[in-house]
From Swiss-Prot:
TM spans (from-to): none
Gene label: pgk
Top-tier EC class: transferase
Entry protein name: Phosphoglycerate kinase
Residues reported to bind substrate: 21-23, 36, 59-62, 119, 157
C-alpha cells in the first residue's frame, strides 16, 4: 500500500486521533455483535503501547433529528471497549466543546478516550455526513497532527471524521484493519493467484452491475446466485414464476451475459416455495424454470454441484452475497454448499466481502475457515468495482 501506516509515525506522548468503525448493532442498549470493536483492537493497543493517547471517533446508526439520538449513544461501546482493553475508557459523552477539550487535555500516555457518536453532528445540517469543513478542522485541532483511519466500513464515504480530519493534519495514516482490508481485497482483484473465481449473490442486479462488469474483466469465472438469478433467467426467456425480478434491468442482464463470453456461471435449478413467508410447499425445480405460482428462494442441489465443480482448483475466491434466503433453514443449503466448496480448496485465498455474506458465514459457523472476512459491506463492494475510496485517497502518501 502506497500510504503511510500507523507504524510509520512516532506516537509517544502524542494525542492521536483515530477513526474506528464502532457501528455495532444494539438491542435495548446491549451490543448484539461486537466484531467491529474486536477488529479495531490491534490498532488501539498498538497506539497505547507506543505511549500515544488514543482519541477515538465513530458513528453509530443514522441520526437526522434530535429524536434519533435515542439509543444511539456510544456509552455501551465505551464500556465494552474498556472491558476488552482491561483499562478505563474516558467517555465525555459529547462531540465538541469545553468538556471534551478538557478531557482530552487531561489524558496521559497510554490512555483512551471515545468521542460521542459523530453523527450527532448531523442533527444540525448534516455536518458529519456532508464533511463540513469547520467540523473537520475542529476535530483535527484536538490532536497533535496525527490521524489514524482504521474504519474501512466508512472508507467509501467522505465524512468530516475521516476525510475532513485527514485534510487538516500533518500525517493521516492507515490503521492495521484498513491496511489488511485493502491488501486482501485489492490484491485479490488486481493481482490474484489464478484460477480466480468470484461469487456474487444477493437479491438485486442493480446493486452489483459495476462489480459484475469489473470482475468479468479480472476473474476467470463469475458465479451468480441469490435473487438476481431470476433477472438473468428472464432476460433469456426462462420462466421464473413469481420470483423476484428487476424488469428495468433485463437489458443490462442480457448485455452482461453477452459480454461475459461464457465467464458468467448461472444456477441450473432452484429451491422453490409457493410463498415467501407462509408457504405450504417447498421443492426443487426440475431445471432452470420456476413453476407457476412458485418463487425461487435458493439455488438447488444441481447448482450446488455445478458451483462446487466451478470452484475446484481455485486459488483465489471472492464471495459477496448469499445464494438464497439463508436466514431461513429451508433456504440455506445453497449458501452452506458454496461456503463448503470454497473452504475445501487446498491453499485457497478466500475472501468474504462483508454484509450478508459475512453474517451468513458467522451464523452458519464457517467464519474461521475463510482467509479474510471484510468489515465493510459498501466499502468492499466499491473496491470490487474498482473504485477509489475517498477515506483511503485522503491518507498521506509514503
Amino acid at each position: 500500500m502506497a500510504k503511510l501506516t500507523v507504524k510509520d509515525v512516532d506516537l509517544k506522548g502524542k494525542k492521536v486521533l483515530v477513526r474506528v468503525d464502532f457501528n455495532v448493532p444494539l438491542k435495548d442498549g446491549v451490543i448484539t455483535n461486537d466484531n467491529r470493536i474486536t477488529a479495531a483492537l490491534p490498532t488501539i493497543k498498538y497506539i497505547i503501547e507506543q505511549g500515544g493517547r488514543a482519541i477515538l471517533f465513530s458513528h453509530l446508526g443514522r441520526v437526522k433529528e434530535e429524536a434519533d439520538k435515542e439509543g444511539k449513544s456510544l456509552a455501551p461501546v465505551a464500556a465494552d471497549l474498556a472491558a476488552k482493553l482491561g483499562q478505563d475508557v474516558v467517555f465525555p459523552g459529547v462531540t465538541r466543546g469545553a468538556e471534551l477539550e478538557a478531557a482530552i487535555n487531561a489524558l496521559e500516555d497510554g490512555q483512551v478516550l471515545l468521542v460521542e457518536n459523530t453523527r450527532f453532528e448531523d442533527v444540525d445540517g448534516k455536518k458529519e455526513s456532508k464533511n463540513d469543513p469547520e467540523l473537520g478542522k475542529y476535530w483535527a485541532s484536538l490532536g497533535d497532527g496525527i490521524f489514524v483511519n482504521d474504519a474501512f466500513g466508512t472508507a467509501h464515504r467522505a465524512h468530516a471524521s475521516n476525510v475532513g480530519i485527514s485534510g487538516n493534519v500533518e500525517k493521516a495514516v492507515a490503521g492495521f484493519l484498513l491496511e489488511n482490508e485493502i491488501a486482501y481485497i485489492q490484491e485479490a482483484v488486481e493481482t490474484p493467484e489464478r484460477p480466480f473465481v468470484a461469487i456474487l449473490g444477493g437479491s438485486k442486479v442493480s446493486d452489483k452491475i459495476g462489480v459484475i462488469e469489473n470482475l468479468l474483466e479480472k476473474a476467470d469465472k463469475v458465479l451468480i446466485g441469490g435473487g438476481m438469478t431470476y433477472t438473468f433467467y428472464k432476460a433469456q426467456g426462462i420462466e421464473i414464476g413469481n420470483s423476484l425480478v428487476e424488469e428495468d434491468k433485463l437489458d443490462v442482464a442480457k448485455a452482461l451475459l453477452e459480454k461475459a463470453n461464457g465467464k458468467l456461471v448461472l444456477p441450473v435449478d432452484s429451491k422453490e416455495a409457493n410463498a415467501f413467508a407462509d408457504y405450504t410447499e417447498v421443492k426443487d425445480t426440475e431445471g432452470e424454470a420456476v413453476d407457476p405460482g412458485f418463487l425461487g428462494l435458493d439455488i438447488g442441489p444441481k447448482s450446488i454441484a455445478k458451483f462446487d465443480e466451478a470452484l475446484t482448483g481455485a486459488k483465489t475466491v471472492v464471495w459477496n452475497g448469499p445464494m438464497g434466503v439463508f436466514e431461513n433453514p429451508d433456504f440455506q443449503a445453497g449458501t452452506i454448499g458454496v461456503m463448503d466448496a470454497i473452504v475445501k480448496q487446498p491453499g485457497v485465498k478466500s475472501i468474504i466481502g462483508g454484509g450478508d455474506s459475512a453474517a451468513a458465514a458467522i451464523n452458519l459457523g464457517r467464519a474461521d475457515k475463510f482467509s479474510w472476512i471484510s468489515t465493510g459491506g459498501g466499502a468492499s463492494m466499491e473496491l470490487l468495482e474498482g473504485k477509489v475510496l475517498p477515506g483511503l485517497a485522503a491518507l498521506t502518501e509514503k
